[in-house]
């Protein structure tokens, strides 16, 4: 379903967003 797909994308993109945020802080 759409929620399963959204969840997969969220899991994929979340680490990237966190990494970008951490890089900007430094």
From Swiss-Prot:
- What is the scientific name of the source organism? Neoponera goeldii
Keywords (alphabetical) are:
Antibiotic, Antimicrobial, Cytolysis, Fungicide, Hemolysis, Membrane, Secreted, Target cell membrane, Target membrane, Toxin
Cell compartment(s), UniProt: Secreted; Target cell membrane
Q: Which family does it belong to?
A: Belongs to the non-disulfide-bridged peptide (NDBP) superfamily. Medium-length antimicrobial peptide (group 3) family. Ponericin-W subfamily.
Q: In which tissues is it expressed?
A: Expressed by the venom gland.
Q: What is this protein called?
A: M-poneritoxin-Ng1d
Select a single GO molecular function from the record's annotations and give it: toxin activity
BP GO annotations: defense response to bacterium; defense response to fungus; killing of cells of another organism
Q: Which GO terms describe its cellular component?
A: extracellular region; membrane; other organism cell membrane
Q: What does this protein do?
A: Has a broad spectrum of activity against both Gram-positive and Gram-negative bacteria and S.cerevisiae. Has insecticidal and hemolytic activities. May act by disrupting the integrity of the bacterial cell membrane.
Q: Which Pfam families match?
A: Antimicrobial_4 (PF08024)
Q: Which domain of life is it from?
A: Eukaryota
Ranges annotated as spanning the membrane: none
């Amino acid at each position: 379903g759409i929620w399963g797909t959204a969840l997969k994308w969220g899991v994929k993109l979340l680490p990237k967003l966190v990494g970008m945020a951490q890089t900007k802080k430094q």
